[in-house]
Amino acid sequence: MTYVLFLLSVGLVMGFVGFSSKPSPIYGGLVLIVSGVVGCAIILNCGGGYMGLMVFLIYLGGMMVVFGYTTAMAIGEYPEAWGSGVEVLVSVLVGLAMEVGLVLWVKEYDGVVVVVNFNNVGSWMIYEGEGSGLIREDPIGAGALYDYGRWLVVVTGWTLFVGVYIVIEIARGN
């Protein structure tokens, strides 16, 4: 299980390095889609079935449309790949080398600490009492998001709406 999580994490980091070198919009969108799938697999591997499915449906469902549209608008006759130019290939290799160096440095000095502390988790408790009950963590997290983070949801929705509006206005030519 740990080995699978490690391989998924390496794939996610390699996807980010591949996106940051972005030789062509086609490959950048493809790498983001693959990284989204790998991120959903990491969430599923850690036991978050509901959240992994929601991220998969919302992120990949919405973003594949956006990536398809932007790729169609910005496609070149001969798109540049990661191995087609020395500069792009060197940037990918330097990015991967820096990630490997970071992993080795963290492993050597054991500098990973938990920086998030949940102080009021008790107010999220749904079932208290004698006996057994079965409540998954995912629905509790979704409920907490819409209860305690309602303004975050509103701001996020408004930001997405404004972003779509700006993209439509730019694509229209006004």
UniProtKB/Swiss-Prot annotation:
Q: How does it sit in the membrane?
A: Multi-pass membrane protein
Q: Where in the cell is it found?
A: Mitochondrion inner membrane
Q: Which GO terms describe its molecular function?
A: NADH dehydrogenase (ubiquinone) activity
Per the UniProt entry, what are the Gene Ontology biological process annotations, in alphabetical order? mitochondrial electron transport, NADH to ubiquinone; mitochondrial respiratory chain complex I assembly
Q: Which UniProt keywords apply?
A: Electron transport, Membrane, Mitochondrion, Mitochondrion inner membrane, NAD, Respiratory chain, Translocase, Transmembrane, Transmembrane helix, Transport, Ubiquinone
Question: What InterPro entries does the entry give?
Answer: ComplexI_Subunit6, NADH_UbQ/plastoQ_OxRdtase_su6
User: Where is it predominantly found?
Assistant: mitochondrion
Kindly report, in one word, the top-level EC class recorded for this enzyme: translocase
Q: Where are the transmembrane segments?
A: 1-21, 24-44, 47-67, 86-106, 151-171
Where are the disulfide bridges?
A: none
An example of a Pfam family matching this protein is Oxidored_q3
GO terms under cellular component: mitochondrial inner membrane; mitochondrion
Q: What does this protein do?
A: Core subunit of the mitochondrial membrane respiratory chain NADH dehydrogenase (Complex I) which catalyzes electron transfer from NADH through the respiratory chain, using ubiquinone as an electron acceptor. Essential for the catalytic activity and assembly of complex I.
Q: How does it assemble?
A: Core subunit of respiratory chain NADH dehydrogenase (Complex I) which is composed of 45 different subunits.
Family listed:
Belongs to the complex I subunit 6 family.
The name this protein carries in UniProt is: NADH-ubiquinone oxidoreductase chain 6
Organism, scientific name: Gorilla gorilla gorilla (Western lowland gorilla)
- The protein's gene is named MT-ND6
